[in-house]
Amino acid sequence: MNNIHAIILAAGKGTRMNSTKPKVLQILSNNTLLEHVLSQVKTLCNKIHIAYGFEGKQVQQKINNPSINWVKQVKQLGTGHAVAQVMPYIEGNSISLILYGDVPLIKRSTLYDLINKTQQSGIALLSVILNNPTGYGRIIRNNKQIQAIVEQKDASNMQLNINEVNTGIMAINSQLLKQYLNEIDSRNTQGELYLTDIIACAAADKKTISSIISKNKFEVLGVNDKVQLAELERLFQKDQAIQFMKQGLGLKDPTRFDCRGTLTFGQNCEIDVNTLIKGKVALGNSTTIEPNCIIKNTIIGNHVSIFPNCVIEDAVIGEGVTIGPFVHIRPQTHIQTHAKIGNFVEIKKSTIGKNTKISHLSYVGDSTIGKNVNIGAGVITCNYDGVNKHQTIIADGAFIGSDSQLIAPIKIGKNAKIGAGSTITKSVSENQLSVSRTKQKNLKYRSKK
């Protein structure tokens, strides 16, 4: 493609958001609105320019991209004024692609087509047909040729009946853009410089104005308040879920699935309702996730079964593992193949060996547990002394009886056994049985008189 400059307008405060953050930093599926736009243009353009205003330092710090040219719009005097602030940095022999930081679902493929149209005609608009066009600038045509764009507040009653509207997104030869920006004025109800007025200038100049009518109205929707943001989130999530399903992922209900990050998966994977994926998550083949689970930054192997109401964060789960229900696996945990983690178990910063079972009501923290170990119900690794965390090591084949406490730092040897109800404060050697209990007393029961 020719020399392409992206101009992203991101100066608005977003008053209706009622937020200390500027509108373009509101979050949609784990990324800011502006980051969504940038992700679609970064491979299309030679240079990206962002016109910023409200809380500009906050915006720049969040994006943190030194290759972007940041241009301050001191006064918000309209879209034409915003673009004019950027023009000193635009090369004449180029195409300017103009976008908005609060229109986050625009597709790269649409922008690619728009640029191609511009290379043929010099100007190309992106429009959309809406059943209810209220609030949008109308596309005015004469014999199918675009003549102007009229904003809602300046439109006549006849023009208000038009349902083809301007999305604001356009591509234009940069020399023409500079020329027509010098020809527009602020004689309108808003007293602003409308970027859309350059279309009337081009039509008067007998220029052919091309257009693409978006087939997907959702990709050109803007965001003005938290209600619209939530609506757009649902549209984004459903569209993403459908794409996953087309790639082979089984989703019980695509409207009740959220991926706020990236998800890769093998064949025959099934995810039930109300599952949230965050960060980078990878699923192997034939893995199932049942309802109400949260999976974050985790690698999950083949043939893993995750039962309802589990939270798994920053972990590695080996092949054939079963987890849940009601399990919390915290960061830096590695569960090796065919281990079983049962209901109401919490594991933190630990390695759980092959074929090991932790079936009920246990806490395991800062521990290394070998293979073929059985951890009974209610076992606690007491890893914190009030100041420091300490490690528990349990070797292969050990058996830890129910309701035992292991006071770290401690090591339980290979094939050792801990009797139920014990509090173990000293390490136990290989093949030893350790029991720590007070002597049982059976006292005569005295009934009340």
From Swiss-Prot:
Its cofactor is Mg(2+). Residues 248-449 are annotated as: N-acetyltransferase. GO terms for cellular component: cytoplasm; membrane. Residues 1-226 are annotated as: Pyrophosphorylase. Transmembrane segments: none annotated. It catalyses: alpha-D-glucosamine 1-phosphate + acetyl-CoA = N-acetyl-alpha-D-glucosamine 1-phosphate + CoA + H(+); N-acetyl-alpha-D-glucosamine 1-phosphate + UTP + H(+) = UDP-N-acetyl-alpha-D-glucosamine + diphosphate. The active site is at H360 (proton acceptor). The keyword Cytoplasm applies. Keywords: Acyltransferase, Cell shape, Cell wall biogenesis/degradation, Cytoplasm, Magnesium, Metal-binding, Multifunctional enzyme, Nucleotidyltransferase, Peptidoglycan synthesis, Repeat, Transferase. Mg(2+) binds at D102, N224. Residues 227-247 are annotated as: Linker. UDP-N-acetyl-alpha-D-glucosamine binds at residues 9-12, 23, 73, 78-79, 100-102, 137, 151, 166, 224, 330, 348, 363, 374. Pfam families: Hexapep (PF00132), NTP_transf_3 (PF12804). Binds 1 Mg(2+) ion per subunit. The keyword Phosphoprotein does not apply. It is an enzyme of class 2 (transferase). Its EC number is 2.7.7.23, 2.3.1.157. Acetyl-CoA binds at A377, N383, Y384, S402, A420, R437. GO terms for molecular function: glucosamine-1-phosphate N-acetyltransferase activity; magnesium ion binding; UDP-N-acetylglucosamine diphosphorylase activity. Pathway: Nucleotide-sugar biosynthesis; UDP-N-acetyl-alpha-D-glucosamine biosynthesis; N-acetyl-alpha-D-glucosamine 1-phosphate from alpha-D-glucosamine 6-phosphate (route II): step 2/2; Nucleotide-sugar biosynthesis; UDP-N-acetyl-alpha-D-glucosamine biosynthesis; UDP-N-acetyl-alpha-D-glucosamine from N-acetyl-alpha-D-glucosamine 1-phosphate: step 1/1; Bacterial outer membrane biogenesis; LPS lipid A biosynthesis. GO terms for biological process: cell morphogenesis; cell wall organization; lipid A biosynthetic process; peptidoglycan biosynthetic process; regulation of cell shape; UDP-N-acetylglucosamine biosynthetic process. In the N-terminal section; belongs to the N-acetylglucosamine-1-phosphate uridyltransferase family. Catalyzes the last two sequential reactions in the de novo biosynthetic pathway for UDP-N-acetylglucosamine (UDP-GlcNAc). The C-terminal domain catalyzes the transfer of acetyl group from acetyl coenzyme A to glucosamine-1-phosphate (GlcN-1-P) to produce N-acetylglucosamine-1-phosphate (GlcNAc-1-P), which is converted into UDP-GlcNAc by the transfer of uridine 5-monophosphate (from uridine 5-triphosphate), a reaction catalyzed by the N-terminal domain. NCBIfam families: glmU (TIGR01173). This is Bifunctional protein GlmU.
